[in-house]
């Protein structure tokens, strides 16, 4: 479609400031790519061309004044969990199909303040509940990658699959996502891009549709580690409207990408050698460790003994919090309202039955069950105790290492329909990412190799709380060593070639 859609954020920033192209030209190139590819990929639920062009025009005026912000003129996508003032925000659910927020989320507010151009709202699993972007009420998202040996439609990962697919297919230079149990890192791995879940509290949750409040955290997607650093610096910062938002200065994450890893100790958790781990995932992990050694890091084994209990604990805690958070959708105050109701209780029941999809209903039922009087101690309280042990394991490991290296996901992207009928199999996709959310730590996925069928595979770098700088340093070094230059078959810059 245009060479402009092939730029990184850093390149686009430099080009805009050097006046090699305008923000309007950059925005129009991406809107053209969306118009051509989104009908197939379904990466966006809502595209906002008029708003984007107005923001681009404002960016050009700022650029002409010589006072550009960190993201002035940079076109990005916003996951449809972030409230957008005056723009429909659905959370991927029918129950919010006509919800138009009267305010902007704190994260996108910061990005707009820094001059970002928001192209539209990216598709996602309903209420961020899913690992494949198959539960959206607005249809599944197609991964722009293809296997070498067939033309199957692949999942982009979830829940932030639309954000990841949009960035991978060059329909945006970057995107926002949320990560509750792996919803940034796993789609990044499946789509061959980079994405970071910051420390819990690094970014404000104000204005993000809530799933599990003690686990949800906003973060960026981009095609490079450096671009993620640029985005996160804009997104992060204390917000008095969110009581969990940390009162900490936001470091220069972009500068941290240049630090290197010489002298750092990198841990490999023994417990991440999961039963049934494929040989290609094991080899990818070993190769990543070897790359870091070659770059000057010391690589050692560490133990996280309670890791094996993380998935079970997560799928008690997250549904419990979801059951509470989603109780607000009753058909009265906002969202879908059923018609022809007999009484108030019937209104509640019908509105929720019609508005929520099957996976959301499943998690609400599980959450309500574990919070019930007879099972609270047996399930929810026990899961919270295990969560504390998992956090303690990480704290102990970080007494002897600076970062941890693991696979991001147990496999490459799979085809739509392969595991959707087995919710337990779908939940197992989060086995390597969930422990980090339970501990509230920062972690990043970067593309580090290809599967035997030509699909991207990611490695995950985990850091201490509020030490995203080391995560970026290790990720950038690994990115340079891996030299991942493969790109998906379906992307904006191949459209004229008939891809």
UniProtKB/Swiss-Prot annotation:
Parts of the chain that traverse the membrane: none
Arranged from A to Z, the UniProt key words for this protein are: ATP-binding, Ligase, Nucleotide-binding, Protein biosynthesis
SUPFAM superfamilies to which the protein is assigned, alphabetical? Amidase signature (AS) enzymes (SSF75304)
User: How is this protein annotated for GO cellular component?
Assistant: glutamyl-tRNA(Gln) amidotransferase complex
Question: Entry's Pfam families?
Answer: Amidase
Q: What class of enzyme is it?
A: ligase
**Active-site residue list:** 79, 159, 183
Q: Which GO terms describe its molecular function?
A: ATP binding; glutaminyl-tRNA synthase (glutamine-hydrolyzing) activity
Endpoints of the signal sequence: none
Entry annotated with the keyword ATP-binding = yes
The EC designation for this entry is: 6.3.5.7
Biological process, per Gene Ontology = translation
Reaction it catalyzes: L-glutamyl-tRNA(Gln) + L-glutamine + ATP + H2O = L-glutaminyl-tRNA(Gln) + L-glutamate + ADP + phosphate + H(+)
Summarize subunit and interaction data from the UniProt record for this chain: Heterotrimer of A, B and C subunits.
| Family affiliation | Belongs to the amidase family. GatA subfamily.
Function, in words: Allows the formation of correctly charged Gln-tRNA(Gln) through the transamidation of misacylated Glu-tRNA(Gln) in organisms which lack glutaminyl-tRNA synthetase. The reaction takes place in the presence of glutamine and ATP through an activated gamma-phospho-Glu-tRNA(Gln).
Name of the protein this chain belongs to: Glutamyl-tRNA(Gln) amidotransferase subunit A
Please give the organism. Granulibacter bethesdensis (strain ATCC BAA-1260 / CGDNIH1)
Recall the taxonomic lineage recorded for the source organism: Bacteria, Pseudomonadati, Pseudomonadota, Alphaproteobacteria, Acetobacterales
């Amino acid at each position: 479609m245009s060479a402009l859609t092939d730029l990184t954020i850093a390149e686009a920033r430099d080009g805009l400031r050097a006046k090699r192209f305008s923000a309007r030209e950059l925005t129009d190139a991406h809107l053209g790519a969306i118009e051509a590819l989104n009908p197939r990929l379904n990466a966006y639920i809502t595209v906002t061309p008029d708003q984007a062009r107005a923001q681009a025009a404002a960016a050009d005026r700022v650029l002409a004044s010589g006072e550009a912000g960190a993201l002035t003129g940079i076109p990005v996508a916003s996951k449809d969990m972030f409230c957008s003032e005056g723009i429909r925000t659905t959370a991927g659910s029918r129950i919010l199909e006509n919800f138009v927020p009267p305010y902007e989320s704190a994260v996108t507010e910061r990005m707009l303040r820094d001059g970002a151009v928001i192209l539209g709202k990216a598709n996602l699993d309903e209420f961020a509940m899913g690992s494949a972007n198959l539960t959206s009420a607005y249809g599944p998202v197609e991964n722009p990658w293809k296997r070498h040996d067939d033309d199957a439609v692949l999942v982009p990962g979830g829940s932030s699959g639309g954000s990841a697919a949009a960035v991978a297919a060059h329909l945006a230079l970057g995107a926002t996502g949320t990560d509750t149990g792996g919803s940034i890192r796993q789609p990044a791995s499946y789509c061959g891009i980079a994405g970071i879940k910051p420390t819990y509290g690094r970014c404000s949750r104000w204005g993000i549709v809530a799933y599990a409040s003690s686990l949800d955290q906003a973060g960026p997607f981009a095609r490079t580690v450096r671009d993620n650093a640029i985005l996160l610096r804009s997104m992060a910062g204390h917000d008095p409207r969110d009581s969990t938002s940390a009162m900490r200065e936001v470091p220069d994450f972009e500068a941290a990408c240049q630090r290197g890893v010489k002298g750092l100790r990198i841990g490999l958790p023994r417990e991440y050698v999961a039963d049934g781990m494929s040989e290609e995932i094991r080899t990818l992990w070993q190769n990543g460790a070897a790359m870091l050694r070659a770059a000057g890091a010391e690589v050692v084994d560490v133990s996280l003994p309670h890791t094996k209990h993380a998935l079970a604990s997560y799928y008690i805690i997250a549904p419990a919090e979801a059951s509470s958070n989603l109780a607000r959708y009753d058909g009265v105050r906002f969202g879908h309202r059923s018609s022809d109701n007999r009484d108030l209780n019937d209104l509640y029941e019908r509105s929720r039955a019609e508005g929520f999809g099957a996976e959301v209903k499943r998690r609400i039922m599980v959450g309500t069950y574990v919070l019930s009087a007879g099972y609270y101690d047996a399930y929810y309280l026990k899961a919270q105790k295990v969560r504390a042990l998992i956090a303690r394991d990480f704290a102990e490991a970080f007494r002897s290492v600076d970062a941890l290296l693991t696979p991001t996901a147990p496999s490459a992207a799979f085809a739509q329909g392969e595991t959707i009928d087995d919710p337990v199999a779908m939940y197992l996709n989060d086995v390597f990412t969930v422990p980090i959310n339970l501990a509230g730590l920062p972690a990043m996925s970067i593309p580090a190799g290809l599967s035997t069928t030509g699909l991207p595979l990611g490695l995950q770098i985990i850091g201490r709380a509020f030490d995203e700088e080391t995560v970026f340093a290790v990720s950038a070094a690994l990115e340079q060593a891996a030299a991942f230059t493969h790109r998906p078959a379906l992307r904006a810059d191949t459209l004229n070639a008939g891809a």
